Amino acid sequence: MVSKLSQLQTELLAALLESGLSKEALIQALGEPGPYLMVGEGPLDKGESCGGSRGDLTELPNGLGETRGSEDDTDDDGEDFAPPILKELENLSPEEAAHQKAVVESLLQEDPWRVAKMVKSYLQQHNIPQREVVDTTGLNQSHLSQHLNKGTPMKTQKRAALYTWYVRKQREVAQQFTHAGQGGLIEEPTGDELPTKKGRRNRFKWGPASQQILFQAYERQKNPSKEERETLVEECNRAECIQRGVSPSQAQGLGSNLVTEVRVYNWFANRRKEEAFRHKLAMDTYNGPPPGPGPGPALPAHSSPGLPTTTLSPSKVHGVRYGQSATSEAAEVPSSSGGPLVTVSAALHQVSPTGLEPSSLLSTEAKLVSATGGPLPPVSTLTALHSLEQTSPGLNQQPQNLIMASLPGVMTIGPGEPASLGPTFTNTGASTLVIGLASTQAQSVPVINSMGSSLTTLQPVQFSQPLHPSYQQPLMPPVQSHVAQSPFMATMAQLQSPHALYSHKPEVAQYTHTSLLPQTMLITDTNLSTLASLTPTKQVFTSDTEASSEPGLHEPPSPATTIHIPSQDPSNIQHLQPAHRLSTSPTVSSSSLVLYQSSDSNGHSHLLPSNHSVIETFISTQMASSSQ
């Protein structure tokens, strides 16, 4: 005996005294054995003897009162949970109720995890879903699943409800197989069958034994005949009976799990559909997306993978205009030298100024850019127009070889379009000029003019910005082709870098978002192979000239800067002058001259004078430039 009370015992005594119970009554109650010790069939814990609901345990016919002393049964809903299946035992005969109570009591005395595995095995053997257990016992679906699969602890009263259902289900199944065709109907009017009728009927579920037979038959014949299906029905029912431990002659006792010919037919139909779907999915995965037209090289890794490519004829390329929405098209461009075709991927989207770096000039990703008005987006890659078919009326006499390098803006002037450009530009020759214009400042466009297969000189042509929007209506899109790595391409990359030729000029502006490329290179030639051996022999960079005038006044051209280039032939020396500006807005212009000399000196017999020259049609009264 403990001579001193603990703190908990002291608090309990104080609570009893505060409830109105006198000390004499408390001592008398402790001295006399009260009826609270006689509840149920065994002694209970003294700590729970004061509960007011102990009298309810005497009404339970399964004798579960002795197990109510567990601590987990006094949780939140432990006192409120009353499984309906336990109340239904009162409707059974006394012998049947006593038998089920004895079996449930024995199961409660065993290890809960071992009994849970036994119940789970029984459910799998007879293809009984857990939903049926939940509908009958009132247990929580998640709690029941965790208890059967993981051994999660469950309160004694809930386990008693589960074990009661388990014992009753065993009796029902035994009666079904014993009375094959009618045993299941004998027990339906009884009270213990009422909860099962309220729930949904069990769905048919194929057992593992039947599935093994059907899959083996499917390998032999994917669409069996009616006779073959009936044979499979007998085999499946026999296997299900053997799985349940009963004779195959008692197949009618399977109840809702009985295999029929219709169910076998549906199973084969579903398997055929699944196989066809898997085959189609595998073929789609194997084939992948359809390849693009043309045997040209694949797009590099830096190409936009999200842009689909479609076939676009060269005649349709001329009609493409720059829009707000980004699209992508591919054009089949025939080579002017009769070589293989190359596929040009054209993306209609604006290019950031970072794409104007010299390192990206040789990129094979083409940008098809045009506009219906306003400033044009920059073009960051080399663009080839010489290989396009001359199907457009405005470009029916375009020179064959024309390469445009890093144009911040593109403007096309054709023989049939002088009216749209007004009197400022006239083109009476047989050629077409494609030039690049910046969006904020005037440009001095050096044009390399040639005749035959020789490259002669670089002619600066001066323009100013901004032009009137109507001047940009006939703009045509420059299309870039896949250009192979060559010395000429490397030379072009050097031309676009301001530090390559004009490294001694510290005032050269860097590439910025507001000021794009200061110059645009235009090369015309009939044979690109002669351009591969070009080497710069002399470079002259003239100082920038700035001029400003008020609106409405025409300012005369600034004094010309004469540049003499030594050459073997005096006729090769060009006298260059800046041309008239096209508008009176303040402009900043710069002109430069670079002479390229081919390794073959025999091909330099003539210079600018050319009947089909690009420059000849523009060096007119509107542009003051002379040649000697």
Curated annotation (Swiss-Prot):
| Ranges of the DNA-binding region feature | 199-279
Cite the location of the cross-link Glycyl lysine isopeptide (Lys-Gly) (interchain with G-Cter in ubiquitin) from the record.
K117
Q: Where is this motif: Nuclear localization signal?
A: 197-205
Answer whether the UniProt record assigns the keyword Phosphoprotein to this protein: yes
Quick one: where is this thing mainly located? nucleus
Q: Where in the cell is it found?
A: Nucleus
Q: Which residues form the HNF-p1 domain?
A: 1-32
Record-linked CDD domains: homeodomain
Residues annotated as carrying Phosphothreonine in the record are T74
Q: Where is the POU-specific atypical domain?
A: 87-182
- Span list, region Disordered: 47-78, 183-205, 284-338, 540-585
Task: Briefly state the modifications made to the protein after translation.
Answer: Ubiquitinated in s SPOP-dependent manner; leading to prteasomal degradation.
What residues bear Phosphoserine in this entry? S70, S93, S247, S313
Question: For bias kind Polar residues, which ranges apply?
Answer: 324-338, 560-575
Q: What happens when the gene is disrupted?
A: Mice are born at less than half of the expected frequency. Neonates are slightly smaller than normal and do not grow normally. After 5 weeks mice weigh only 50 to 60% as much as their littermates. Mice develop non-insulin-dependent diabetes mellitus (NIDDM) 2 weeks after birth. Mice exhibit elevated levels of blood glucose, combined with reduced blood levels of insulin and insulin-like growth factor I (IGFI). Males and females are sterile.
Q: Name one GO cellular component term.
A: cytoplasm
Q: Which InterPro entries match?
A: HD, HNF-1, HNF-1_N, HNF-1_POU, HNF1_dimer_N_dom_sf, HNF1a_C, HNF1b_C, HNF_P1
Q: What does this protein do?
A: Transcriptional activator that regulates the tissue specific expression of multiple genes, especially in pancreatic islet cells and in liver. Binds to the inverted palindrome 5'-GTTAATNATTAAC-3'. Activates the transcription of CYP1A2, CYP2E1 and CYP3A11.
Q: Name it.
A: Hepatocyte nuclear factor 1-alpha
Give the organism the record lists: Mus musculus
